[in-house]
Design a protein with these regions (language model features):
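Short aromatic/hydrophobic "clamp" motif used to bind/position activated sugar donors
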Residues: 79
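A conserved acidic beta->alpha catalytic loop
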Residues: 24, 36-48, 59, 83
């Protein structure tokens, strides 16, 4: 089985950080969905340069509505969401690829609905991580409720 993982992002005026984020996942995600909520900078151009499917969504001051719109465009079996300033560390890429292999090996009935991923915050000037916690970052597409 070859299950796909779609990266889904909502962005606005993220030209300073978006390229770094997309570079960190370009070899991990099978598809990149970038939903722009009204950028006036080069955000769209940068996303398109990485081969992302870029769409527009009028901002209604509702992150969940924009996120769900992004999810609705994805064709993958699993949806990975990141913010534009998030990065998958190089040291974690092999672990991510092993996760994809494990997902491909599982029968449909055993697939998880949610996958929690480590999330590093509070990185100091020397690069030391001050805090790591787990966040839901990957969800199974067909397990999402239709709202």
């Amino acid at each position: 089985m070859n299950r796909k993982i779609s990266l889904c992002m909502i962005v606005k005026n993220e030209e300073d950080v978006l390229g770094r984020c997309l570079e960190s996942v370009r070899d991990l995600a099978d598809e990149m969905i970038v939903t722009d909520t009204g950028s006036s900078d080069r955000t769209r151009e940068i996303a398109e340069g990485f081969g992302a499917n870029v769409s527009s969504f009028e901002w209604t001051d509702d992150f969940s509505r924009a996120r769900n719109f992004s999810f609705s465009l994805a064709t993958g079996d699993f949806l990975l969401w990141l913010d534009a300033d998030d990065v998958i560390p190089a040291a974690s890429k092999e672990e991510f690829l092993r996760l994809k292999e494990r997902l491909n090996a599982l029968p449909d009935d055993d697939l998880p609905d949610v996958i929690m991923c480590p999330y590093d915050t509070g990185i100091d000037e020397s690069g030391t991580i001050a805090c790591t916690y787990y966040r839901e970052r990957i969800v199974r597409k067909n397990s999402l409720p239709v709202l």
